[in-house]
Amino acid sequence: MANSRRTAAIIVAGGRGLRAGGGGPKQYRTLAGQPVIYRSMQPFCTHPDVFAVQPVTSPDDIALFEQAVAGLTHRPPANGGATRQQSVYSGLEALAKDAPDIVLIHDAARAFVDAALISRAIVAAQRTGAAVPTIPVTDTIKQVNGTNDVEATPDRATLRIAQTPQAFRYDVILEAHRRAAREGRDDFTDDAAIAEWAGLTVATFEGDAANMKLTTPEDFVREESRLAALLGDIRTGTGYDVHAFGDGDHVWLCGLKVPHNRGFLAHSDGDVGLHALVDAILGALADGDIGSHFPPTDPQWKGAASDKFLKYAIDRVHARGGRIANLEVTMICERPKIGPLREAMRERIAEITGLPVSRIAVKATTSERLGFTGREEGIAATACATIRLPWGPNGLSG
């Protein structure tokens, strides 16, 4: 991919978007808890080949903008104009002091752009100098007259739906905008149209059907439903386990053999951390508890390693088409000290479950010398598991 200093992005967010309803500019409304403009800017701000993101906003919306995109790295917003064309021109001029080679121009109302589409845009602009993402027209199109009578049926094989980000050599599109401003042309609805008017050949590259523009209240309702379906049925389960100390020189905790002056009194290896996690996962599935799946009266589990139990619980999630979102376990004991072992425990649980370490938390506390853990008679553990299951045909997960 090209050097990251070569490409900048303009995010056009100066419009009012009143057709979308909601009582304010649509780019500051939320979808699944995130502002639309955050969703549309974030992929550019984190793309390795985009060195600068130049937002364009209404001066009246600065406070809304700063709140909506908190945490993203971007240039100070340029002031938007009365039309989209004027807003883009403002963004182009704002980049002039540190001019990029390639500029991507993206509508803030397109909240589903992704890194792959951005990469395709950069490559297309490098290859052609002016390019627009498109998707095929699948409906039959009718051309009508002033009284809405059909005049023609264009061949849809020659038609495409244009999207953003549209990609250009910066110097070429800047000059096209400057010329349009000099000649009083402010009626272009996208930047590809300005490039065409200026005599440039505009290529196309593969767009993305999901990269739709949010325009009407119905668009927001539909996309909220779609995003909710993608999240699936989110469930949480909790678990608790305790084992008393007995004779021995080690204990098993979160999959690790930990030297200690006592051992556990247990049917299996007594790993309270993993047992609590197993119960939490089974609870999220509404699938009984560890004792119902691995009865302590069954001799086959005598001395069994608890990683088998955890793998079994994970397999139960996968068998229902689900996945683990997060696992958390809290160890409650005076000794052994958990702090020095915390990262090794996280890594061991990650190894057993196949999850990234970033989705596993291991915490520790004491009971302030109260109760059986305070008297060092044993160890307790609590756990929490968050899982996602797919929705079934009746709107419920299986």
Curated annotation (Swiss-Prot):
Question: Which positions does the site annotation Transition state stabilizer cover?
Answer: R19, K26, H267, T366
The record's listing under InterPro entries reads:
IspD, IspD/F, IspD/TarI, ISPD_synthase_CS, MECDP_synthase, MECDP_synthase_CS, MECDP_synthase_sf, Nucleotide-diphossugar_trans
Q: Which GO terms describe its molecular function?
A: 2-C-methyl-D-erythritol 2,4-cyclodiphosphate synthase activity; 2-C-methyl-D-erythritol 4-phosphate cytidylyltransferase activity; metal ion binding
**What are the record keywords, sorted?**
Isoprene biosynthesis, Lyase, Metal-binding, Multifunctional enzyme, Nucleotidyltransferase, Transferase
Q: Where does a divalent metal cation bind?
A: D241, H243, H275
Kindly indicate whether the keyword Transferase belongs to this entry: yes
Entry cofactors = a divalent metal cation
Region annotation 2-C-methyl-D-erythritol 2,4-cyclodiphosphate synthase: residue ranges? 235-398
**Pfam families given for it?**
IspD, YgbB
Mind telling me which residues the site (Positions MEP for the nucleophilic attack) is annotated on? R156, K213
Q: Where does 4-CDP-2-C-methyl-D-erythritol 2-phosphate bind?
A: D241, V242, H243, H267, S268, D289, I290, G291, T365, T366, S367, E368, F372, R375
- Positions of the UniProt region annotated as 2-C-methyl-D-erythritol 4-phosphate cytidylyltransferase: 1-234
- What's the Enzyme Commission number for this chain? 2.7.7.60, 4.6.1.12
Kindly list the biological process annotations in GO that this record carries: isopentenyl diphosphate biosynthetic process, methylerythritol 4-phosphate pathway; terpenoid biosynthetic process
HAMAP family per UniProt: IspD, IspDF, IspF
Query: What does the similarity note say?
Result: In the N-terminal section; belongs to the IspD/TarI cytidylyltransferase family. IspD subfamily. In the C-terminal section; belongs to the IspF family.
Spell out the protein name for this chain: Bifunctional enzyme IspD/IspF
